[in-house]
Structures are given as structure tokens and as C-alpha cells.
Amino acid sequence: MTHTLYPTPFALYPINISAAWHLGPLPVSCFVSNKYQCSLAFGATTGLRVLVVVVPQTQLSFLSSLCLVSLFLHSLVSAHGEKPTKPVGLDPTLFQVVVGILGNFSLLYYYMFLYFRGYKPRSTDLILRHLTVADSLVILSKRIPETMATFGLKHFDNYFGCKFLLYAHRVGRGVSIGSTCLLSVFQVITINPRNSRWAEMKVKAPTYIGLSNILCWAFHMLVNAIFPIYTTGKWSNNNITKKGDLGYCSAPLSDEVTKSVYAALTSFHDVLCLGLMLWASSSIVLVLYRHKQQVQHICRNNLYPNSSPGNRAIQSILALVSTFALCYALSFITYVYLALFDNSSWWLVNTAALIIACFPTISPFVLMCRDPSRSRLCSICCRRNRRFFHDFRKM
């Protein structure tokens, strides 16, 4: 029996394989080749190849899981008799999927950790939860099918799955924009002094956050409900700019009235949210500047004027909104160009898809870098991994 070896990059997060066995005619073996790398061997069989590995639950990291998913996708490609078009490790789509899922799932784990520990969440955390879920939805619905295309799986035959993924991508993208806008507007309300015209709204704003998040999801689910109606579950790499957002589904919008109404609603929402975010960011900077001028005579000799929790939270929101504005401005310009010129090349379509997924990929790391509590949780996880790595080397 011949075997094909697929090396896995477990150098940073080595795992201890506790068991591996055969399932009937599908031989699967796993072994540790050295202290820094684990390799999996798939039996050369016909049909679908199955990966079965048992790993201690307490020692399984996110990165290890993603590596196993990559191997499983690679085995699916081998079952179809196709090969990837380029090395997987150099593919920007796969890199974006790994980094984006790792960041967003880590942030979701952080919020779940606080919830089950009984900590009272901050008002902004409620918005960030929905933002993280929406970003994860964008990455899972758009980038993973494109990663499957990189592996050679170019036929998306599930009609319902095509509709669902296309619909989920549009809803996730809209909620991501709306949540970022809501976050910036809420922040500008909370940092204004109590004696300003925002005083009454400042008291009531936290009570409306939950309702605002629900309305945001409901609005985008209703607006995008017309989108799957015109979707066909066929893979099309040709003339993608006329058919839709995703390479694995085509969406010919033959009804010009429906197309115009949908385009008007989505464009109005995006422009409105972007305008509100720019206004909120400018207002935050102006309020901070005035506050700095007022207290400058009090803390003239302070060497760390930006080290307070309030300033760190505001800087985190500003960094997030700036990242959003940059990514979506570039993607908007790219998609306008694609809409105006029908003969756009395929690489430009891929570039536009890469840009639109930049914000869901980067945003969790922006939040974790600016918030010391999130960074502290990540450092605890890193210390546990280093302790396990030390024990692993003694084996």
C-alpha cells in the first residue's frame, strides 16, 4: 500500500497525537516525525479519503484545527484527481482564511469566556460581538469556497448551498458595515460631556444597543432576501463581473427594476454608514483635542497621557473605523471599476475579493492589540502553549 505524505506546519503549536487507526479500506496513519513537525499519511484509495485523528481536547489549538482542515481539503482534491494550481502556503486566499478565522474565533472565545465567568460586558462589547459574528460569516461564506477553488474543487453543485452562502455573505457584509457604524456613533455619544446637548441621549444610548443590533440583522436579512431568488447554483469563472460577487455562484439579475431597487438600497446604506463613521471619527478627535487642552495645565508633566482605559478604548474604536474606511473605500473603487468595464480581468476580480475580506481579517487583531484585557487572555494562551511545548520536547 502506497502512502502520500502531507507535511503540516505544527512548528508553533505541536500537538500530541493520542490515537490513530484504520477505518475499513481507508488506511489513515499519523506520526510525529520530530519534535517540531507532525505528518499525516493518507492511504492511496479510490473515492473520498477520510482523516481520523484523535487529539487531547485541552491541547488542541485553533491553528492546529485549521491545519487539519487544510489537509482534509487537500485530501478531497486528491479524491477528485485534481491538483492545486499553486502551493497552498503561498496562496493569499488560504492565508486570509487562516488568519481571519483564527482572529475572529479567538475574539469570540474571549467574549464567551467573559460570559461564562459572569463578567458584566461593556456596552461596546455587545456591538463587537455582533461585529465579530458578521466578520466570521463573511470569511466563512466567501473565502472558504474560494479556497476550495484553489485546491481544485471548481464545481459547486449544491443548489441550496450556493444560495445560502451567497445570501450569508451579503448579510454578513451588511451587518459588518452597520455594526461598525453603530460602534462609532455610540462612542461619540458616550465621550461627550454630560452638560452638552448629548446628555439625555448619553443616558439612554446603552439601553438601545441590543435593539439596534437586532434591527441591523433584520434589515439586512430582509433586504438581501431578494438576492438568492436570482441565484443559480453553477460555477462560472467567465464574465464574473456581470453575474455576482462569488466565483462559485452566478446571479443573473434579469429584472432591471429589482436590480435597481436592490442597488439603491445597498448603496444608500453603505454611503450613509460610511458618512456617519467619518463624522463620528472627526467628532471623537475634536472632543479629545478639546479635552486635552482643558486638562493640559493639570497633567503637564504626565509622561503617559494616553494610558487611561478610556483613551485606549477610544483609540481602539478610531483604529477600527480607520481600518474599515480604508478597506471598504478601496473595495468600493474596485467594484465600481468592475461594474463600468465589462472586460475586467479575472485577477482584478480576485483582488477585489481580497480587499473586501481585509477588514473582517484585520479587525479582531486591531481590537486585541488596543485592548490590554484581550491581549492578556492571548498571552495566557501563549504561555500554556509554551508550557505544553516544553513538556512535548521531554517526550
Curated annotation (Swiss-Prot):
Side Cytoplasmic, residues: 73-93, 192-208, 289-316, 368-395
Sorted UniProt keywords: Cell membrane, G-protein coupled receptor, Glycoprotein, Membrane, Pheromone response, Receptor, Transducer, Transmembrane, Transmembrane helix
Glycosylation, residue list: 239, 343
Designated name of the protein: Vomeronasal type-1 receptor 2
Other observations noted: The chimpanzee, gorilla and orangutan orthologous proteins do not exist, their genes are pseudogenes.
Family, per entry: Belongs to the G-protein coupled receptor 1 family.
The keyword Membrane appears for this protein: yes
InterPro entries for this protein: GPCR_Rhodpsn_7TM, Vmron_rcpt_1
Natural source organism: Homo sapiens
UniProt superkingdom: Eukaryota
Annotated GO CC locations: plasma membrane
Membrane topology of the entry: Multi-pass membrane protein
Pfam families named among the record's database cross-references: V1R (PF03402)
Function statement: Putative pheromone receptor.
Residue spans, topological domain Extracellular: 33-51, 115-170, 230-267, 338-346
Transmembrane segments: 12-32, 52-72, 94-114, 171-191, 209-229, 268-288, 317-337, 347-367
A molecular function (GO) term: pheromone receptor activity
Any Gene Ontology biological process: sensory perception of chemical stimulus
Subcellular location: Cell membrane
